[in-house]
Amino acid sequence: TVAVPDDEVGSGFDRYTIRLNSEHTLIKLKDLDLLKVGETMTMVYSDKKGLDQATGQTTWNDFRNAFKTSPLFPAYDEATGEFADPVKINKDEFNPVAKMYYNSAMKQSKNYSLNGNFYLILEPLKNLRWRNNFGIRYSSWSYRGYVPAYNLNGSTEVKYRNTVTQQGGMGLGWQFESTLSYDFSINNQHKFSALLGTTIDKSGLGENYSGSNEDVEFDDFFHAYLGNAKTVEKGRTTLSGSAWGVSTLASFFGRINYDYQNKYMATVIMRADGSSNFARGHRWGYFPSVSAGWNVTEEEFMEDAKSVLNYLKIRASWGENGNNKLDAFRYLGTMALANSQNAAYYYFGDKSGTPFIGSFIEYNSNKELTWETSRQTDIGFD
């Protein structure tokens, strides 16, 4: 448990973490662990209250408000304990601590997360292993904020109605991976390690919601919930919600490692990845890579030099990498309705009449979207 109390207005943070790791051999046959299972799990809950950062824009924000206020001006009235009123230098003067408190202090964020991995390892023969992993990722969160009505200077810093905001959501993802590996050697000089595997990963299973309203029945944070607002009114009530974009990635891969007397080493890798982020016919990408190394200090002609150079390895590699990081279904064209950010109005007949709300093309379709491929070559020494 971690609790960090601060001297800032109304701030606090608590976090609780639980970790669980274990491994069990269920079937043992002589020197072979025939069947082994295990898991690693991490659960985290956090609760954050009050201030977390300065609010406002680049120019007009809490830091600017504090810097422009005279250091002789008290934040609180010693007689009443309330926020002090500023000296009326001009009509825009106000107490920056009071504004920061009213706009930022009364809020709470809660976060829950679970990351778990469960595995099963089967070793029917020496150095032959079949490993299966299933991982799950879960998170959920909620936010609640309350801004009371206030009057800091009678002109610019006035808020006549209290406001409540609630947000939240959840997200889920999972991954399954299965690999088969085998290690062997020839004459104890030529050592090989081979691996074949497949992975499927699904992410983006989740949703978000958000809402705000004014005129809460009870003027305090404890009762600050959307259900306690007096009315639902256009211009003062906002509600929104959306689902995440689901994305699936399937992969097949293979790898061979070769080592000759710890002198000469080589690795060949080939993988094929299929992503649902692309249209049919463009979802699969193929990415090979090779690498080689020469341990020069293992050569006989280096024996006399080991007193000054005990290790020298020259290595080189080449490979291709794939990138599928874009929003799900971006290859499809989408339409959008006009809103406060995107104006789309149409006239029927005379343009002097009343315009009608319309729709517009937000994204053009592109069925040719596919993997972004980059090539990388490295040469170096250790």
Q: Locations of the language-model features?
A:
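Short secondary-structure subsegments characteristic of cysteine-rich extracellular domains
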Residues: 9-23, 283-293
